[in-house]
Structure formats: structure tokens, C-alpha cells
Amino acid sequence: QECKCHGVSGSCTTKTCWNTLPKFREIGFVLKEKYNDAVHVEVVRANRLRQPTFLKIKKVRSYQKPMETDLVYIERSPNYCEEDSTTGSVGTQGRLCNRTSPHTDGCDLMCCGRGYNTHQYTKVWQCNCKFHWCC
């Protein structure tokens, strides 16, 4: 929820509030965590016509069954490291990576164990620095 105050000279004589959605980055972070913790399930067909089809945990990593808010999957994700025209994945080979980053832009993760070549770049830019004589 966000609020805004209205009034003379910044006073808050009237306050207007409204509901807002979470930031896109926050939603993405939660979805990525759910993706990382997703549970593999398999479809179990009923033997009788009156029984419904349901999902069963494929590999038991704990004795707890997934909650309604957990992410489950039936098929494994494609290998994003390799090019795959059927899924539209262009792979990660030849992309620039950050050698010191532990995140998805880091070479250890992006290069998928293939190794990588390092290049040193020098960037020159206007810094708008000012010199102040102090003493």
C-alpha cells in the first residue's frame, strides 16, 4: 500500500492511500526461489473411470508433500547451456560474463563448466570530479 499526504506547506491534513502490486524485481526473486525449490511430480492415471487423475511426488527429498503455494513440475527444464532450436534456447556459448560475480552473469554459472577466456577492459569516462583545497 502506498499513501500520499495532501495539505498546506506539507502538512498531512488529508491522506490518500491505495493498494499497489509488489515491485517486479521482488516478484521475480520469489519466482526464481520457487523454481529452484520445485518438486518433480509424475501424473498417475486412475484405473477406474470414476477416480480422478492426480500427481504423485517423483523423488522424495523429504517426507512433506508440496504445499499449494509450492511450484511442481512434470518435465525437466531444457539445458539452457546448449543451443536448442526446438525450445528457442540460444545457449550461453560466446556470451560475455563477469568472472567475479556469483550470480547468473558470473562465468562459473554461465559457462556451464566449459571454461572461459579472460580479457581485461579499460573504461574511460567523465567522472565530474572536483578538487577542494582544504588546508
Swiss-Prot record:
InterPro entries: Wnt, Wnt7, Wnt_C, Wnt_CS. It holds the Pfam family wnt. Ligand for members of the frizzled family of seven transmembrane receptors that functions in the canonical Wnt/beta-catenin signaling pathway. Required for normal fusion of the chorion and the allantois during placenta development. Required for central nervous system (CNS) angiogenesis and blood-brain barrier regulation. The keyword Glycoprotein applies. In adults, in brain and lung. Belongs to the Wnt family. Disulfide bonds join 3-17, 5-12, 81-112, 97-107, 134-135. Residues 41-69 are annotated as: Disordered linker. Coiled coil: none annotated. The keyword Magnesium does not apply. It is found in: Secreted, Extracellular space, Extracellular matrix; Secreted. GO terms for biological process: animal organ development; canonical Wnt signaling pathway; cell fate commitment; neuron differentiation; positive regulation of JNK cascade; tissue development. Palmitoleoylation is required for efficient binding to frizzled receptors. Depalmitoleoylation leads to Wnt signaling pathway inhibition. Its main location: secreted. Keywords: Developmental protein, Disulfide bond, Extracellular matrix, Glycoprotein, Lipoprotein, Secreted, Wnt signaling pathway. It comes from Xenopus laevis (African clawed frog). GO terms for cellular component: extracellular space. This is Protein Wnt-7b.
